[in-house]
UniProtKB/Swiss-Prot annotation:
UniProt lineage: Eukaryota, Fungi, Dikarya, Ascomycota, Saccharomycotina
PINc domain sequence ranges: 130-262
GO biological process: nuclear mRNA surveillance of mRNP export
Compartments where found: Nucleus
Protein name: Transcriptional protein SWT1
Pfam families in alphabetical order: PIN_4, SWT1_3rd
Bilayer-spanning residue ranges: none
Length: 458
């Protein structure tokens, strides 16, 4: 049987294939004992053995002595090795290696679709959900940082999303014999490891966390794509855009691929790439702060001013107290319009998102005021409602600050007419894709409102 080396661009001296030399078996045995003595419950894994073989083979002439575990950490149960590559040249090499693999294996990637467990965990962040979309090179180069970032998900209200393409690429790399070598022998204790070993560690980490619904990590569903035919870098960017535009998330791309990061930045998607001494907590904290800075006001303004607006309007000097009959009609029309608005928004969002409704920043229990409802229209304007209002002059920003007369119970006849006419127009747009039966029910309701208003104006 012959050993075939995988093709790789010329001029790169970081990748090489090596075979196991039986003469170092004693060193391997001793290294396994060293690892077992340091690991919880004396555990060691197949990946540890792979790592020791590569490490011992490449360093047998350097006089290594029992340092095979290097800078490798493990998860809490001691099952999955976690490491970060701290040398910038190594990180760049991994990125270039994966780019070359994407060019060579584009067709095979397109034809392979592994099934993954991607049920959504129940998270309730205070603002738009932060979604870290992770590239293959980031998993291979910075698995330890990713694990720490995942462990902070409940504290900083974020998710890590693994695109389908990344799972495919890791699966294709798991048998690669090529070695990611650290050149700086004097300052870095990381040992040579094969790309296949690093890919298997990444696969194990993804599998373990996908099996846990509360892990803070999910996989991209096959239907969660704007362009299902996209490949390689474009498919990862497509994943980012889906979660940004359709599921209304605050998306941050984790990648060391400069070309992919450039594409993401042109789409207004923030990116995080390798930096010396990169820290997961700082990444999580800054992402949370940026989320708050950009989107907190959307929710803060929803409820706080409603009661104040109604009260201040009701006590403006000079407004006459309407007769009892007007009060009754105004109250009935106001409540019925409000409930119809709530129904239209809830129905539209559920029809658009289906089973993903629990993932978006929508809570039907908070549909308690017209101001709340208008904020949901504002929040989902780009992804849902703008299409319904194509022929309307109403713009997105107008939903953020509707006049009080359009949000509260009318206190005089002119305000009641204005209120009814505005929401009649809006409801026609909201119902534009409803069934004919639902549209007929709306027209019947509108007719009753107009009849009641006309009755008290004569």
């Amino acid at each position: 049987m012959t050993d075939e080396k995988r093709a790789f661009p010329k001029g790169n001296n970081h990748i090489r294939s090596e075979t196991f030399n039986g003469s170092v078996s004693h060193k391997i045995s001793e290294s396994i004992k060293d690892i077992a003595s340091l690991r919880p419950h004396g555990k060691y894994t197949v990946q540890d053995i792979d790592n020791i073989i590569a490490s011992t083979s490449s360093h047998e002439n350097r006089g290594q002595s029992g340092d095979s575990n290097g800078c490798i950490n493990h998860d809490e149960e001691g099952d999955i090795p976690m490491c970060d590559l701290n040398d910038e040249s190594d990180v760049e090499m991994i990125s270039e290696y994966l780019s070359s693999q994407r060019e060579m294996e584009a067709q095979s990637v397109a034809n392979y679709m592994p099934k993954i467990n991607d049920d959504l965990p129940l998270l309730n962040p205070p603002t738009l959900k932060t979604a870290f979309v992770v590239d293959t090179n980031f998993i291979i180069s910075h698995l330890n940082t990713l694990e720490k970032l995942r462990s902070l998900s409940s504290t900083y209200h974020h998710l890590i999303i693994v695109p389908t393409t990344v799972i495919q690429e890791l699966d294709g790399l798991k048998k690669s014999p090529d070695i990611a070598r650290d050149n700086d022998d004097t300052t870095n204790q990381e040992h040579d490891r094969t790309i296949g070993t690093l890919a298997r560690w990444g696969n194990d980490w993804i599998y373990k966390n996908l099996a846990n619904l509360d892990s803070g990590l999910i996989g991209q569903k096959l239907k969660q794509s704007l362009n299902p035919g996209s490949l390689k870098d474009d498919s990862i960017l497509d994943c980012c855009l889906y979660f940004k535009e359709i599921l209304n998330c605050f998306v941050i791309l984790l990648s060391n691929d400069k070309n992919l990061c450039t594409k993401a930045l042109t789409e207004d998607i923030l990116t995080v790439s390798f930096r010396k001494n990169m820290d997961a907590k700082i990444i999580a904290m800054r992402a949370y702060e940026e989320n708050q800075l950009r989107f907190a006001n959307l929710r803060d303004s929803t409820v706080n001013n409603f009661d104040q607006n109604v009260t201040s309007y009701a006590h403006i000097p000079g407004i006459e107290t309407p007769p009892l009959q007007f009060d009754k009609v105004s109250q009935n029309v106001f409540e019925q319009v409000k409930e119809t608005i709530f129904f239209a928004i809830d129905h539209t969002l559920r029809k658009e998102y289906g089973e993903d409704i629990g993932f978006i920043d929508y809570n039907p229990d908070k549909l308690t005021t017209i101001e709340n409802a208008s904020n949901y229209i504002y929040l989902f304007w780009v992804s849902v409602f703008s299409e319904l209002f194509t022929c309307s002059k109403i713009k997105k920003n107008e939903w953020k600050s509707l006049p009080t007369v359009l949000k509260s119970k009318p206190t005089n006849l002119n305000d009641l007419r204005t209120f009814e006419q505005f929401w009649e127009t809006v409801l026609h747009f909201l119902f534009s894709k409803f069934t004919n039966e639902e549209k007929q029910s709306l027209e019947k309701q509108i007719h009753e409102w107009k009849t009641s208003i006309n009755a008290i104006s004569t």
